[in-house]
Amino acid sequence: MFAEFGVLNYLTYLVGAVFIILVPGPNTFFVLKTGIAHGVKKGYLAAAGVFIGDAVLMFLAFAGVATLIKTTPVLFNVVRYLGAIYLLWLGGKMLYAVLTQRDGQSDASAEPASAILKRSLTLSLTNPKAILFYVSFFVQFIDVNAKTPGVAFFILALTLEVISFCYMSFLILSGSFVTRYVKTRKKLAKLGNSLIGLVFVGFAARLATLQS
């Protein structure tokens, strides 16, 4: 399938892409957390930031910028530490909100839509693991001798975005269901926010020790 456009082993790529999307990451937890805290509409807004960020990284990978980052330790470390600091800030902010929240106080602040979009976009763009993925994974399924390697790259990128959209939709709708359940269970909501905050801190620690 799509071999005429320079795509190699598309079905193998499709299966691999599904499993990769299903692996939890910072973007996954941010979208889930947003869906739980702010509802479906803002959950999709968070997902939109992820989609835009992924599209930018895929374009940079195709343009060769991602390879430059991968092979230049200084650039890789800059992206890596920026991402780790941002994840640590997000996790710390969530934990602080839980610790300072008073009983009976609502934990769902009216966070502006623009802030949610910026956060999810920043999470995507400061993830060097995604950069390494697009360089190392995509290249295995593109015939470099094809007349239209750009079309092949676009097909692979679009496939990944569609799979990601389906998975993010599941997370957002699940988060909306969870919201209705925990509205009257404040201790459970606090526990959930604490766990997600700790997950972000854990991702920050792992990202800080990532090697190119």
UniProtKB/Swiss-Prot annotation:
Membrane spanning residue stretches: 5-25, 49-69, 81-101, 122-142, 153-173, 188-208
Compartments it resides in: Cell inner membrane
GO biological process, one term: L-leucine transport
Main localization (coarse): membrane
Molecular function terms, GO-annotated: antiporter activity; L-leucine transmembrane transporter activity
Catalysed reactions listed for this entry: L-leucine(in) + H(+)(out) = L-leucine(out) + H(+)(in)
Disulfide bonds: none
Similarity comment: Belongs to the Rht family.
Name by which UniProt lists this protein: Leucine efflux protein
Taxonomic source organism: Klebsiella pneumoniae subsp. pneumoniae (strain ATCC 700721 / MGH 78578)
